């Protein structure tokens, strides 16, 4: 009886936190963001310059866009469509209870897990759909209607679907391969893309069996001493994402892996080994890899000398974003203009959407408006992500990133490095992972160290 009373108190507490959180952040979501027409805007390796939106696609040299072979003029609508097409993952409420707790929301503590999900989602978008893909309905999302993004309206989206369900919901991730699903649409490119689009979002659903959903990520976090309701930092989330992808058994995910840099060092042979690992299918191609590099951009505060480095990273075609934020808040950084970073904010709490339902609503998984913040406000602790489709792509990326690191760094040493060979060649002990424990002892030590260094999340 006492336990029941405690659960009720916890539920009331979470409802209050969600309501307070939305009151705090909803005005931010609805506030207009202003962009200059005189400076280029970079979004995950694509350059837009609104000053030339009515002109030819070739920009003049003084425009500021210098990404070879990837320069586009792009008008405002093209930029909006590109931004809105990125997958937005936020706090949710009223989802199935997290095992071992009374929590049915991540409001107040799950923001870095959400920004990590957004980075991984962008990597999967590149893997399955490519950087040129945009959601056809992106511009149908209106940000001017202040009611559009309230929790009440989100419930309207799901109400019609709930009416079709009887009895207790079953939360499950479809096991049919994407290739099987889209087979009959092989001549319909748009249908193929839409199937992948929905499938990727479903992998991040807030149900226990969603491959990269909050419930699963928390389970992997338990192996490092984390639990639901704890604060997670960018480096810890990087390792959790790696484990989630490694453990995913979905046939469509056997061609991608994640590598997490050790002590700001990417060991080229270790990455290539992961990409060349035997695949479960008949496809003998190299695996794609998402490289995650946890770094600190200074001591207590971000060193402004790293501004050009961050801008250089976000200008690369290989970049899938940065898990970062400002003190007490985690954001997903996806671009910049001048000295301001462009980001997506996970702090707005939306209602649970059951992604196992056919044609579930997509609107709440796409952010209607970009936000900007000064680089000076950025917390120094962050994790940078890159995507490479195969071994050759990785080799090109490592060369290009190394050049960028040298040119953008005012420090004597680059923020991170690519080195030839394996980590074991540099006196790192290679530990075999216990089958009963997803994290090795070395990984646990790393995770505990990272968790004490990183900022507190709201």
Swiss-Prot record:
GO biological process terms held by the UniProt record: aggrephagy; autophagosome assembly; autophagy; mitophagy; piecemeal microautophagy of the nucleus; protein delipidation; protein processing; protein transport
Recorded catalytic activity of this chain's protein: [protein]-C-terminal L-amino acid-glycyl-phosphatidylethanolamide + H2O = [protein]-C-terminal L-amino acid-glycine + a 1,2-diacyl-sn-glycero-3-phosphoethanolamine
Keyword flag Phosphoprotein: yes
Enzyme Commission numbers on file: 3.4.22.-
Molecular function via GO: cysteine-type endopeptidase activity; cysteine-type peptidase activity; protein-phosphatidylethanolamide deconjugating activity
Modified residues (N-acetylmethionine): 1
Entry annotation: catalytic residues: 111 (nucleophile), 345, 347
Modified positions (Phosphoserine) in chain numbering: 451
Keywords for the protein's UniProt record, in alphabetical order: Acetylation, Autophagy, Cytoplasm, Hydrolase, Phosphoprotein, Protease, Protein transport, Thiol protease, Transport, Ubl conjugation pathway
Cellular compartment(s): Cytoplasm
Modified residues (Phosphothreonine): 452
Function: Cysteine protease that plays a key role in autophagy by mediating both proteolytic activation and delipidation of ATG8 family proteins. The protease activity is required for proteolytic activation of ATG8 family proteins: cleaves the C-terminal amino acid of ATG8 proteins MAP1LC3 and GABARAPL2, to reveal a C-terminal glycine. Exposure of the glycine at the C-terminus is essential for ATG8 proteins conjugation to phosphatidylethanolamine (PE) and insertion to membranes, which is necessary for autophagy. In addition to the protease activity, also mediates delipidation of ATG8 family proteins.
Name of protein: Cysteine protease ATG4C
Species annotation: Homo sapiens (Human)
């Amino acid at each position: 009886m006492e336990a029941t009373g405690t659960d009720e108190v916890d539920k009331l507490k979470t409802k209050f936190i969600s309501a307070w959180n939305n009151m705090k952040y909803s005005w931010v979501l609805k506030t207009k963001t202003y962009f200059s027409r005189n400076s280029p805007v970079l979004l995950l390796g694509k350059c837009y310059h609104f000053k030339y939106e009515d002109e030819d696609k070739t920009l003049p040299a003084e425009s500021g866009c210098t990404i070879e072979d990837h320069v586009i003029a792009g008008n405002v609508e093209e930029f909006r469509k590109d931004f809105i097409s990125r997958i937005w993952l936020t706090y949710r409420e009223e989802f199935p209870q997290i095992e071992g707790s009374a929590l049915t929301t991540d409001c107040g503590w799950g923001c870095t897990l959400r920004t990590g999900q957004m980075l991984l989602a962008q990597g999967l978008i590149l893997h399955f759909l490519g950087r040129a893909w945009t959601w056809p309905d992106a511009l149908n999302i209106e940000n001017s209607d202040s009611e559009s993004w309230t929790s009440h309206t989100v419930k309207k989206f799901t109400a019609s679907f709930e009416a079709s369900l009887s009895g207790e919901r079953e939360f499950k991730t479809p096991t049919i391969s994407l290739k099987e699903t889209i087979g009959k649409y092989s001549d319909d490119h748009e249908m193929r893309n839409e199937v992948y689009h929905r499938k990727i979002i479903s992998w991040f659903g807030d149900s226990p069996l969603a491959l990269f959903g909050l419930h699963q990520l928390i389970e992997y976090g338990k192996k490092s001493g984390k639990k639901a309701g704890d604060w997670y930092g960018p480096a810890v989330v990087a390792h959790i994402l790696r484990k989630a992808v490694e453990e995913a058994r979905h046939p469509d995910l056997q061609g991608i892996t994640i590598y997490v840099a050790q002590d700001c060092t990417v060991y080229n042979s270790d990455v290539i080994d992961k990409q060349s690992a035997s695949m479960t299918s008949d496809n003998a191609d190299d695996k794609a890899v998402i490289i995650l590099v946890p770094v600190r951009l200074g001591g207590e505060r971000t060193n402004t000398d790293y501004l050009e480095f961050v801008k250089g990273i976000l200008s690369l075609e290989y970049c899938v974003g940065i898990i970062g934020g400002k003190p007490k808040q985690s954001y997903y950084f996806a671009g910049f203009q001048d000295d301001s970073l462009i980001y997506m904010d996970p702090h707005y709490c939306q209602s649970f959407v059951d992604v196992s339902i056919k044609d579930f609503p997509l609107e709440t998984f796409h952010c209607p408006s970009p936000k900007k913040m000064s680089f000076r406000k950025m917390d120094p602790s962050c994790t940078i992500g890159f995507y490479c489709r195969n071994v050759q792509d990785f080799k090109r990326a490592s060369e290009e990133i190394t050049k960028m690191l040298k040119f953008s760094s005012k420090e004597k040493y680059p923020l991170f490095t690519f080195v030839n060979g394996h980590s074991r060649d540099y006196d790192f002990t290679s530990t075999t992972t216990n089958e009963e424990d997803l994290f090795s002892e070395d990984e646990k030590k790393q995770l505990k160290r990272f968790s004490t260094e990183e900022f507190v999340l709201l």
